[in-house]
């Protein structure tokens, strides 16, 4: 004997989602939360720009739950540039994105601390490069960042 089952509206919606799944990651907006460029020895320091500056970069990732499945992910950059033992520049940037996530709970942390930073990094790098150039400094290209290694190091640090 055949049995017929009638699907509830909720089951039909869920079945429809299998054919038309929601994207796992949706970036709602990206924005500059904080941006600061200081050139303490300007304009005299520009005469000393005969060689590439020594640049130190510190990068951090932070994620906060906003509500439901919405999160704010921030990349924080602190950069110091020195030339001939003088401070050339100090740049700080916090670049953020508001994202909606449709991922299983066990994948949430890696997505927030690895995948979203990978997505927004090129935009943050562009802001930094443009800021330095507009500040009268030579362009500086930040190499890609290994967010997987950062995540693993973060997990090991108590």
Task: Pin down the residues of each PLM region.
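N-terminal intrinsically disordered, cationic/polar leader segments
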Residues: 5-119, 123-158
């Amino acid at each position: 004997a055949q049995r017929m089952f009638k699907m509830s509206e909720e089951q039909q919606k869920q079945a429809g989602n299998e054919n038309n799944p929601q994207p796992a990651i949706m970036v709602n907006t990206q924005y500059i939360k904080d941006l600061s460029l200081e050139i303490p020895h300007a304009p005299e320091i520009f005469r000393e720009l005969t060689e590439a500056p020594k640049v130190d970069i510190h990068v951090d990732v932070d994620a906060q739950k906003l509500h439901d499945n919405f999160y704010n992910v921030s990349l924080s950059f602190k950069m110091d540039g020195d030339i001939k033992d003088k401070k050339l520049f100090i740049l700080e940037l916090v670049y953020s994105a508001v994202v909606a996530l449709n991922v299983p709970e066990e994948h949430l942390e890696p997505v927030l601390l690895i995948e979203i930073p990978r997505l927004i990094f090129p935009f943050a790098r562009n802001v930094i490069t443009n800021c330095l150039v507009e500040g009268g400094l030579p362009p500086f290209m930040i190499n890609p960042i290994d967010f997987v290694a950062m995540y693993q190091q973060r997990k090991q640090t108590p």
